[in-house]
Amino acid sequence: MTEIQRLLTETIESLNTREKRDNKPRFSISFIRKHPGLFIGMYVAFFATLAVMLQSETLSGSVWLLVVLFILLNGFFFFDVYPRYRYEDIDVLDFRVCYNGEWYNTRFVPAALVEAILNSPRVADVHKEQLQKMIVRKGELSFYDIFTLARAESTS
């Protein structure tokens, strides 16, 4: 493992710890806070469907199924899962991208990581210069930018 890769992996792990990214479902009412109209609309639609089913002779026997399904499916809105970021997921296009998104392109690295790379005696001057050029050109760097630098370091 190269020095840049090690520093990037440490940063990703500290980010996972700080943001409680552990792939575990946690009870949360963030859905209600973010989408109160949708949440109320769900209940209005549920009660409207329930009223129609109770009025119908053919559907009134399966009302219990509607109630059970609604409760089960509604339960999913009360759980958030914060997926764990991993170094191995960077620049990989597979199912995890659908789950995590391309976080490595949309999140910027902390300034502490850039400073650690620039101050590390184990990183070659060529890579430090390349990093400084990237900073001048782009301003803020994404995790993917540092990943490409780590890849360049491993090939040299």
UniProtKB/Swiss-Prot annotation:
Subcellular location: Cell inner membrane
Its membrane topology: Multi-pass membrane protein
Record topology, Cytoplasmic segments: 1-35, 80-156
InterPro entries per record: Memb_YlaC
One Gene Ontology cellular component: plasma membrane
Domain of life assignment: Bacteria
Transmembrane segments: 36-56, 59-79
Keyword terms: Cell inner membrane, Cell membrane, Membrane, Transmembrane, Transmembrane helix
Stored Pfam families: YlaC (PF10777)
Periplasmic compartment residues: 57-58
Keyword Cell cycle: no
Signal peptide: none
Protein name: Inner membrane protein YlaC
